[in-house]
Regions:
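A short beta-turn/loop motif at secondary-structure boundaries
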Residues: 74-76, 165-167
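Non-heme Fe(II)/2-oxoglutarate
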Residues: 1-74, 82-84, 91, 191-196
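Catalytic core of non-heme Fe(II) oxygenases with the double-stranded beta-helix
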Residues: 83-152, 162, 169, 179-192
Length: 196
């Protein structure tokens, strides 16, 4: 038997140590309530963190070029960036990111067992319990979330981070992107030029 992976979902991983200055910048951000945790009131925090922004932009570009391989001159721009704060007993609710193409999360501070869960919303009508879960039969899949880890994913992919079970507040930086440049194809009547 041969099995082919048709339309796989790319999840990108990049690592970079957070600097003391960057961490202090994040810790001093004003916060507001969110569903299950708190988030920064500033939703463009990467504007104040040039080196980290450059790392994230380079990672997003590599991910985009490697997975989409666009024919025309198009790139992704970061539209919003904010910090999430989950104290012990708090969580980050299940959600996706509308009005964005690729989203990402960079972990600033974590506990040993922190994870991010991704979900697929197909097969809700019929469920088959499995003896061994894998990429084909799972409704969700998780990856470790640790300090300095950047995870990129399609913005439409539902995800969440469970309740903090350790003693440390989990802090992450999230962001959205949107294409700038030529999208679609003029001769196919799908062409669109998006400019800032």
């Amino acid at each position: 038997m041969n099995i082919h992976n048709l339309f796989p979902t790319p999840i990108g991983f990049f690592d970079r140590a957070i600097t003391d200055e960057e961490k202090l910048f994040i810790l001093n951000l004003e916060q507001r309530p969110n569903l299950g945790n708190t988030t920064s009131t500033n939703n463009k925090i990467l504007n104040g963190m040039t080196a980290l922004r450059s790392f994230i932009e380079e990672s997003v570009n590599l991910y985009f070029q490697s997975t989409v391989r666009p024919k025309h001159d198009v790139s992704l721009r970061i539209t919003q960036s904010w910090a999430n704060f989950s104290s012990p007993g708090q969580h980050h609710h299940k959600h996706a990111h509308p009005n964005s193409y690729i989203s990402g999360v960079y972990y600033i501070q974590t506990n040993p067992n922190d994870r991010i869960y991704f979900y697929r919303d197909e097969w809700k009508q019929i469920k088959f319990p499995s003896e061994n879960y894998n990429e084909y039969n799972s409704e969700s899949w998780w990856f470790e979330a640790f300090e300095g880890r950047l995870i990129l994913f399609p913005s439409s992919l539902t995800h969440m981070v469970p309740t903090v079970e350790g003693d440390t507040t989990r802090i992450s930086l999230s962001f959205n992107t949107f294409p700038v440049g030529v999208v679609g194809e003029e001769v196919e009547l799908t062409g669109l030029r998006l400019e800032v």
